[in-house]
Amino acid sequence: MNPKKFFIGLMSGTSVDSIDAVALQFGRDEVNICGTCSYPIPTAVKTSIFSLSEQNEISIELLCKTDTQLGELFSQAAIELMLSCSIKPQQIAAIGSHGQTIRHAPPGQHQIPYSKQIGDPNIIAARTGCMVVADFRRADIAHGGQGAPLVPAFHEQIFRHRHRHRAIINIGGIAN
C-alpha cells in the first residue's frame, strides 16, 4: 500500500510577524492537518521587507539579500515543522511557498499588472530536499487572474455543499 504523501504550505502575511507553516494530507473529501508552526521573522529582516514594500525606489542589493534571507527562514520553518511532526523529506509530495509579497498590482488597477514575492524557493528546495512550488501570484496574473489563485480553489473544495449555500469572507490581511 502506498501511504499518502504530506504537503507543506508556507506563507507570511502583510504584518510580517512570522512565517506560518502547515503540514497536510489530502484525501478525496478530507483534509488532515498533521501539524502547524509559526516561525518568527527577525526584526532586521522585517525592516528590510517594509523598506522594500513601502519605498518607491529600492536597492537591488537589498532585494536580493532579503530574498535569500527569507528563503533561509522559510526553509527553517519547513524543517522545524517536519521535525515536530516526524515527517521525513521523502514523505513530502511538495512544499508550497507563497513567499512574502512586497509589491502587488493586479490587472484592472494598473496599466501593467505585476506582483513580486520574495523568499527564494530554490533555497527552500536545497535545504529541505523537497520539491517546492512557488510564485503562485505571478502565474495567476499571467493567466489573466488577480494574483490570488489558491484561496478560491481551497474554499470551493472545502466548503462546497450540494444543498447549502455558503459565503466565505476573505479580506486579505484582515479577516481570512
Describe the predicted segments one by one.
Residues 2, 16, 44, 65, ...:
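Conserved active-site and cofactor/substrate-binding residues in soluble primary-metabolism enzymes
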Residues 11-62:
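Short glycine-rich, Thr/Ser-proximal phosphate-binding strand/loop in the N-terminal lobe
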